[in-house]
Curated annotation (Swiss-Prot):
Annotated EC: 2.7.7.1
Classification via NCBIfam families: arch_NMN_Atrans, cyt_tran_rel, PRK01153.1
Domain of life of the native organism: Archaea
Protein name as it appears in the record: Nicotinamide-nucleotide adenylyltransferase 2
Amino acid sequence: MHRGLYPGRFQPFHIGHLEVVKWSMKHVDELIIVIGSAQESHTLSNPFTAGERIEMIRRTLDKENLDLSKVYIIPIPDIMMNSVWVSHIKTFAPNFDVIISRNPLVNRLFKEANVEVLQPPPFDRHKYNSTLIRRYIIEGNEEWKKLVPKSVLDYLLEIHGDERLRSIAGL
C-alpha cells in the first residue's frame, strides 16, 4: 500500500489544489490531505475553520467522483518548531510513505526524516493561489469565482464566506 500525504491550509481549496489531488491519486493508493493551521479561523490569512475546509474538500472530491474511501482529511494544528514538525504530523496522521508538496521547507523537513518526496506539477500556481483568491474576494473582484471548483464557490456563498472575509478586512 502506497499512501501519500498532501499538506496545505486550503484557504480556500482551489482548482490548483484539486489538480494536485487528482495527480496524487494517480501516484498513490491512498491520500491523506492534511489541513494545516487547523486552529486558525476568522483572520485575513485563515478565514475559514478547519471544519469548513474539510467540507469544501469533501464536496469537491465527491462532485469530481473521486473515491472518498481512499482519502483521509485530517486537520492538524500548527506547531512553531520546524525541527519537530514532521513528528507532529506523524502523531496526527495515519502512516504514510511519501509526501506530496512543492514547498521547499516542507520537502526539506521530510527528506531529513527519510520520507520520499513527490513534487506535483505546478498547475498554474500564479493563477491558482489562495492569497490572490482571498484578495479578489475582499476587493469584490468576481474573478475569484473562476479559480475555485463550483462546489467550493457554492459552499462559500452558502456560508457567506465572502461576506466574512470582507468583514474581517474591515469592509
